Structures are given as structure tokens and as C-alpha cells.
């Protein structure tokens, strides 16, 4: 009997083992994501091969353009994962069609490459050489995609928390860059491409909507995504697309759902310094950005004591050699921390500096300081200004002695830097003032309130202006939402500069390019000649005059400059102008609408200083 039991047990075990080999075990989520990614890459490869063959056979231009647009749609599906997990390759495949440099080697010029270059080729001037030029670009893209397909053990990297971060990133990228036409500047195929992005997001999310999720959550999110796709497919015209409606009715609730689903399932990234707060449920939330990322290390992080000390120093002329000017002399709170001059008055009270005084609001949210981007940290900027012979002609070394002689300041430094020895140092002076500047955060404008759900905060004219700003007027391709400065989404780690071709004066009969060479003075890279940091447009109503040299007194004048195509329209553009050369063809009514929108960026916090 015992042997019979053993025999039956042995047979059953064998059957179970065999069944185990016959019936595959359920795939882990990362493996399912990898399978989806593989299918997307296969589809993209097919489309790339198709357009390559069309070039070989010298198809008509119209058919080549169509195949290009089809290829882009396939790319956008795969890009949800490519952009996040392969950021370096993304810059190669889909970077701007502009020569660039790296910060650590500005002398080395990197030629543009990828889809945007191919778009310029296919949609630009056409001759017999176009086919071979286009094919070379196609092969380059094809080789990179091939590397993705051949990557060994690819599934391991698709960890749940990273995939959900990729989804958040894709939503921000589509909102800030996609529907603005940033990466489809000529073809203006951005709306169909956004639909492809949403389709991919939906496919990825459905892998995670298992029995552990409530049916209500799954159905609500899927319905939102499906409706978003339908809306995009039904409103493909780039210039007429209602971005305000799309963002508030689809982007915002979908983004919230993605964040909630990830958080409820514990798909959270490890706690460390990164630009975005992963718990923030809206792209337009006042808590979207993690302030610590844009601050010094913990040792020199802002505290209330340091902010208060910095505020006193900011308005105290003790840092200047002449004792008659402070930081607040040129950065007046009632003027949104600008001075109202074309360019700042020098310390001698007779001459003027080369450049306009920028606002300090939201200075924390930029990774480059000064119009020429010559330094990264606010502390270094402060030191530069204090020691500048035209600005304050001061000395932090001397200031340490003079502040130390003040019982009031000595006590305040002891309180603010209790763990430092000594407490009063050159760096601590700079850090205290920088702590105050970092506290100047303003993200509570009428526009922000509208995007957070209060539909009473913007009227029809302002909403039309926003849609123009994001579309036909191309403003948002440089002044990125939600900050409206040059901090590039969705990573928010790089602050861009642009070459606009700004004139020396408002003279229109014989305009002359402003001689200030911008970033070039410090990098000596020809790419940076006449390049200036993209400033924020928040509170722009209060910060006239405008441009790096203060050449324009009104927003109407600024809009006229851009409407003509910048320096190109004035026939003074340098060869490396980054602003698109063509006219915007905005009507007077449309210009008024864009300006009306920009005035909604005036912040309630800033107005308290008026």
C-alpha cells in the first residue's frame, strides 16, 4: 500500500511538473511592458524601412511627406518609453534642428540630427540631392532604433515606479512641447502625434489595470483617455486646436489619475533630489516642483532665519562700496523686482550698464543665471554682482568685517548659521541673500487658478490668447509651460538660450543688430554668439522695458518684432539665429489676444508689493 501511495505521488508530481512546462507562468508587468515596447519598435522599424525604400525609388515629394508623418506617429507611440529610458538617444533622434554644444565642452559643436532635421529636408526646398540627403538621415535614425531592438535583457529596466514616472513625463512633454509644435515646427502635425502619445499611454496603463484596481478607476481613466484621443482626432488643425479646453478637460484629470494609480500601488521612486514632486497631481500645481533640487545641499538649504537675514542684506547698502545702493536699488519689489530702466544705472550714477535688469521672481526655477548664463548658482551670481565694478564695486571680504562689527548682524548670522564656524563668511552672506531670492516664488496667477479649475479667472479673449501663445504664435516653443521661461520640460534641468536677432534700437528704416554677443563672451562658441537666456514671462505686465537690452517699451512692440520673424524680418539676423525665420502672420486682433493672455500671468503674490 505504501509503495502505491509513493507511486501515485510520483506520477502526480510528474504531471504537475509537465503542466508547469506546458502552461507558461503569467508574465510580470515589466515583461508585458517590454513586449509592448518591442511591438512599437517593430512598427516603427517597418515605417522607417518604408520611407527609406520610398527614397530609394524616388517617390514623389507628396508621398514622401505622408510616409514621414506616418513614421512620426509610430515614433510617438514608442517615444513614451524611449524618451524616458533613452534620453541621450532621444536628443539624437528628435532633437531640435539646431547646432548645439555641451556645457563641459562648448568649443565642440554638435551638428543637428534626426526627425526634425529630416522634416526640414522633406518640407524645405527640393532638388535631386534631397533624396540622398534624406536617406542619410533616415539611416541614422534607423540605426538607433535597431540598437533599442537588440538591447539584451531589456525588460529588467521597466520597473513599475520608473514606468509610471515615464508616463508622468510623457504627459508633461506632450502638454508643454507636443501640442505647442516644438518638435514639428514645419509640418505642424503635433495634434495627430499627441493622439499617438495618448494611445501609447493608454496601452501601458491597461497593463497595470489588473484586478487589484477598482473597475471604477479603470473605466474612468480609460474613458478619459479614449475621449482625449477622439478629441485630438476630431480637431487636427494646429492653429485652431483649443489647447485650453484639451488641457483642463483631458490632460489634467488623466495626469491626476496616473499619479493616484501609481501612488495607490506603491510605485514611488526612492526619495532623493529631483526636479519634480512625484506626489503632485497636476502639471499646474504650486507643488509640482521640488524646491530642494534647485537649492544648494542640505548644509546651505534655505531656512526662515536665513531668508529673513537675506532680506535685510538685500535692502542694505552695506555691500556696496559707495554705501548708497543695495540689491533692492535695481530690483524694486513694486516693479516685480526690476527697475523700470532700459538698462540698469551704474554705481557711478551717471552711466548705464549693458543689459536690462531681470525680475527675480521664480529665479529659483532656472539652472543658469544672468542673461549670458555664465553661472549656475544664485550664490555665484550674488558674488559676481557685488564685486562688479559697475554694479556695486564691493567686496565680500570687506563686508565680512563690517557686518561682524554690527552686533545686530553678528547675532543674526549666529542664529542662521549656528552649525557653521565661523558663522559669518563670504559664502554665508551670499547664501543668505540667495535664500531670500529663492523664497520669491510666484505661481498663483489668474492663469494658474484657471488651470486648477476656476473657470472664472480667464475670459474668452485671454483664452484665445493662450491658444495662440501655444500654437500659431509659437511663444511656448521657447517660453515653456508651466513656468513660461527657458527651463526645458519634462526634465526641467536645462535652461535654454536663444538667438533672436534683437536690434540695437527701435529704428526701423535702417535697423542694426545689437552688438552684445551674449553667451559667446564666456563660451567662445560660435553657436552662442548673440545668444541670451530665455527669461520668464510671468509678471511681464510689470517688467517693462523688454529684451536683454531693454529696446522695446511695450508688449505691442515685442509682439511686432516676433511677428516679423525677429532679426530675420528686420534683415539683421546673425547666421545662427535660432528663432524661426518666417513671419507669424498674426493679425492685430490676435496680437491683442496674446497680450491679454500674458497679462493673466501677473501673480497675486507679486501684486501685494504694488
List the model feature ranges, each with a label.
Residues 1-5:
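Positively charged n-region of N-terminal signal peptides that target proteins for export
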Residues 6, 10-12, 16-27, 228-306, ...:
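Post-cleavage N-terminal segment of exported redox proteins
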Residues 25-288:
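Mature extracytoplasmic or organellar-lumen-exposed domains after removal of signal/transit peptides
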Residues 38-42, 58, 62, 132-135, ...:
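Soluble non-cytosolic domains of exported or imported proteins
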Residues 66, 70, 329, 428-435, ...:
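Amphipathic alpha-helical interaction segments
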Residues 94-157, 161-162, 312, 316-320, ...:
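Extracytoplasmic redox metalloprotein regions
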Residues 276-384, 449-552, 557-560, 568-573, ...:
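Short glycine/threonine-rich turn/loop motifs
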Residues 551-604:
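Extracellular low-complexity, Gly/Ser/Thr-rich intrinsically disordered linkers
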Amino acid at each position: 500500500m505504501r509503495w502505491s501511495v509513493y507511486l501515485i505521488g510520483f506520477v502526480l508530481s510528474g504531471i504537475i511538473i509537465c503542466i508547469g512546462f506546458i502552461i507558461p507562468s503569467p508574465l510580470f508587468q515589466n515583461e508585458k511592458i517590454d513586449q509592448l515596447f518591442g511591438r512599437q519598435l517593430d512598427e516603427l522599424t517597418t515605417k522607417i524601412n518604408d520611407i527609406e525604400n520610398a527614397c530609394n525609388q524616388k517617390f514623389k515629394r507628396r508621398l514622401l511627406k505622408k510616409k514621414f508623418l506616418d513614421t512620426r506617429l509610430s515614433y510617438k507611440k514608442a517615444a513614451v518609453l524611449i524618451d524616458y529610458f533613452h534620453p541621450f538617444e532621444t536628443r539624437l533622434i528628435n532633437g531640435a534642428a539646431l547646432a548645439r554644444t555641451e556645457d563641459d565642452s562648448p568649443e565642440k559643436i554638435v551638428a543637428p540630427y534626426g526627425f526634425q532635421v529630416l522634416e526640414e529636408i522633406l518640407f524645405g526646398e527640393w532638388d535631386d540631392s534631397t533624396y540622398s540627403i534624406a536617406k542619410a538621415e533616415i539611416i541614422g535614425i534607423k540605426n538607433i532604433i535597431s540598437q533599442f531592438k537588440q538591447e539584451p535583457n531589456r525588460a529588467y529596466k521597466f520597473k513599475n515606479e520608473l514606468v509610471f514616472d515615464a508616463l508622468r513625463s510623457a504627459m508633461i512633454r506632450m502638454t508643454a512641447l507636443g501640442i505647442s509644435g516644438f518638435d514639428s515646427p514645419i509640418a505642424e502635425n503635433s495634434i495627430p502625434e499627441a493622439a499617438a502619445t495618448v494611445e501609447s499611454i493608454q496601452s501601458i496603463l491597461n497593463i497595470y489595470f489588473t484586478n487589484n484596481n477598482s473597475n471604477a478607476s479603470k473605466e474612468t481613466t480609460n474613458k478619459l483617455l479614449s475621449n482625449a484621443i477622439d478629441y485630438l482626432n476630431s480637431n487636427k488643425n494646429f492653429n485652431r486646436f483649443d489647447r485650453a479646453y484639451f488641457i483642463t478637460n483631458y490632460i489634467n484629470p488623466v495626469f491626476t489619475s496616473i499619479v493616484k494609480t501609481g501612488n495607490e500601488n506603491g510605485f514611488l521612486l526612492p526619495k532623493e533630489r529631483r526636479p519634480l514632486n512625484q506626489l503632485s497631481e497636476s502639471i499646474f500645481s504650486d507643488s509640482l516642483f521640488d524646491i530642494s533640487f534647485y537649492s544648494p545641499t542640505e548644509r546651505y538649504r534655505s531656512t526662515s532665519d536665513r531668508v529673513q537675514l537675506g532680506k535685510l542684506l538685500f535692502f542694505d547698502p552695506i555691500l556696496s562700496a559707495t554705501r548708497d545702493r543695495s540689491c533692492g536699488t535695481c530690483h524694486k519689489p513694486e516693479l516685480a523686482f526690476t527697475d523700470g530702466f532700459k538698462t540698469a544705472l551704474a554705481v557711478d550714477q551717471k552711466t548705464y550698464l549693458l543689459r536690462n535688469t531681470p525680475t527675480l521672481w521664480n529665479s529659483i526655477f532656472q539652472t543658469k543665471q544672468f542673461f549670458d548664463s555664465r553661472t549656475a548658482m544664485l550664490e555665484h551670481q550674488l558674488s559676481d554682482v557685488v564685486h562688479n565694478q559697475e554694479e556695486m564695486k564691493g567686496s565680500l571680504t570687506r563686508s565680512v568685517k563690517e557686518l561682524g562689527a554690527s552686533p545686530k548682524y553678528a547675532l543674526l548670522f549666529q542664529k542662521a548659521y549656528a552649525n557653521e564656524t565661523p558663522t559669518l563668511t563670504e559664502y554665508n552672506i551670499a547664501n543668505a541673500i540667495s535664500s531670500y531670492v529663492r523664497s520669491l516664488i510666484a505661481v498663483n496667477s489668474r492663469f494658474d487658478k484657471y488651470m486648477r479649475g476656476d473657470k472664472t479667472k480667464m475670459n474668452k479673449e485671454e483664452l484665445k490668447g493662450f491658444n495662440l501663445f501655444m500654437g500659431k504664435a509659437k511663444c511656448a516653443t521657447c517660453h515653456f509651460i508651466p513656468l513660461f521661461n527657458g527651463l526645458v520640460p519634462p526634465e526641467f534641468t536645462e535652461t535654454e538660450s536663444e538667438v533672436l536677432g534683437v536690434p540695437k534700437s527701435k529704428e526701423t528704416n535702417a535697423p542694426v543688430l545689437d552688438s552684445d554677443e551674449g553667451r559667446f563672451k564666456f563660451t567662445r562658441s560660435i553657436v552662442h554668439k548673440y545668444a541670451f537666456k530665455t527669461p520668464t514671462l510671468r509678471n511681464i505686465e510689470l517688467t517693462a522695458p523688454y529684451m536683454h537690452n531693454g529696446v522695446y517699451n511695450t508688449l505691442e512692440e515685442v509682439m511686432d518684432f516676433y511677428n516679423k520673424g525677429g532679426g530675420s524680418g528686420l534683415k539683421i539676423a546673425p547666421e545662427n539665429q535660432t528663432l524661426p525665420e518666417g513671419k507669424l502672420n498674426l493679425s492685430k486682433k490676435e496680437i491683442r489676444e496674446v497680450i491679454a493672455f500674458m497679462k493673466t500671468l501677473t501673480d497675486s503674490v507679486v501684486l501685494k508689493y504694488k
